[in-house]
Each structure stands twice: as structure tokens, then as C-alpha cells.
Regions:
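A short, well-structured beta->alpha microelement
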Residues: 2-34
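Short amphipathic alpha-helical interaction segments
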Residues: 110-125
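A short, conserved structural fragment
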Residues: 124-135
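Long, low-complexity, charged/polar intrinsically disordered regions in eukaryotic proteins
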Residues: 39-76
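Minor-groove-contacting beta-hairpin "wing" of winged helix-turn-helix DNA-binding domains
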Residues: 135-141
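Short amphipathic alpha-helical interface segments
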Residues: 77-103, 107
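Structural alpha-beta junctions
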Residues: 2-6, 33-34, 52-63, 110
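Short, amphipathic alpha-helical interaction segments positioned at domain boundaries
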Residues: 142-182
Length: 182
């Protein structure tokens, strides 16, 4: 067979094929130097790790499971309204213990917790808040800045785009995407 065979095993009940090395970025990455085939079990938050593997080595068969630990493609990267609502809410509290109150805040704002954590990291990066020992304090003197100035925000936007491709693209689109040079 010429080229590469691509298999979609993204379904919940799909079983991993036996005897084929498994790329699981939540653990140790296997040595693939002599492998003709590979199973992509999990997707790293930084897709360049996966791209590097694919561009370095030619596989004749690829099985895409594509489990995503933190599904930012489902939460999005935070709308202007969500950021505004978060700011208005935390502005009312001089100190906010995010170790114990994060879940309540997520529920109150109706924002998934994984996204809320990123949004708070963006605020911290931009100097809107400081976090010390799990306590978040609003910097009321912070100069006005655009959310887009944040590197964390830019990375999150890219992660959402990459995850959408890995979760929703066809196996051919995914393979082509992984083979694209940056």
C-alpha cells in the first residue's frame, strides 16, 4: 500500500489496536524510532509536540483516538462578556480565595472551571490581579489593557483551534494539519 493508512478510533467505545505503540501525552512518550504504526491516544495542550513527532518520522498507519484532557474547544477561549463579568464580580471583593471558591465562582458566572482558571491567569498576566498563596487580589490601579495582549490568551485561542481540528476534523485533515510546517 502506498502512502499512509489513517484510522478513526475517536468513538468512546473504540478499542486501541494491540501491539502498536501508543502516544499518550499524560505519561511517558514511547520511542517510535522503529515503529511503522502509531496510536494517537491523547492530544497535548501544545500541539507542536505532536507535529514534531509526525514530521520527524514516516508512519504507514496512524490510529487517531485523540482524547483531550482539557477540552477547551468546548469552552472556547472566553468572550468579551465573560471577561467583563468576571472582572465586575471579582472587583467587588478585595480578596478572593480561589483555592476554595473557584468552583462557586465558576457556577455563579456560568463559566466552565478549566476556562475560568485560564481567564484568571490572563488577568494575572495583564496585572489586573495578583495571586499569593491562593488568594487573588484585584489591582484597582491597573492600567486598561486589551485581553488580546496576553500571551496566555493567544495560546488558548490557538489551543482551541488546534483541538477543534483534532476533535472534529476528518482523519485526512488531521494528518495534513500535523504534517504542515509552521
Amino acid at each position: 500500500v502506498e502512502g499512509v493508512q489513517l484510522f478513526n478510533i475517536r468513538g468512546k467505545n473504540a478499542v486501541l489496536p494491540e501491539g502498536i505503540p501508543v502516544l499518550d501525552f499524560s505519561g511517558e512518550v514511547p520511542d517510535l524510532a522503529t515503529s511503522e504504526a502509531v496510536v494517537v491516544k491523547t492530544i497535548p495542550e501544545d500541539i507542536t509536540l505532536l507535529k514534531a513527532i509526525f514530521q520527524k518520522q514516516h508512519f504507514s498507519a496512524v490510529y487517531f483516538k485523540n482524547d483531550i484532557d482539557k477540552a477547551y474547544y468546548l469552552t472556547g477561549y472566553g468572550t468579551r462578556e465573560q471577561f467583563a463579568k468576571l472582572y465586575k464580580t471579582i472587583y467587588q471583593f478585595p480578596e478572593f480565595d480561589i483555592r476554595y471558591k473557584l468552583k462557586d465562582l465558576a457556577t455563579y458566572l456560568n463559566i466552565q472551571q478549566i476556562l475560568l482558571v485560564k481567564m484568571i491567569q490572563v488577568f494575572e498576566e495583564l496585572g489586573f490581579v495578583t495571586i499569593k498563596d491562593g488568594v487573588m487580589t484585584v489591582n484597582k490601579e491597573a492600567p486598561k489593557r486589551e485581553i488580546a495582549e496576553s500571551q496566555i490568551y493567544q495560546n488558548l485561542k490557538q489551543t482551541v483551534k488546534d483541538q477543534e481540528m483534532m476533535a472534529l476534523g476528518t482523519v485526512q485533515e488531521i494528518y495534513d494539519f500535523l504534517m504542515e510546517k509552521e
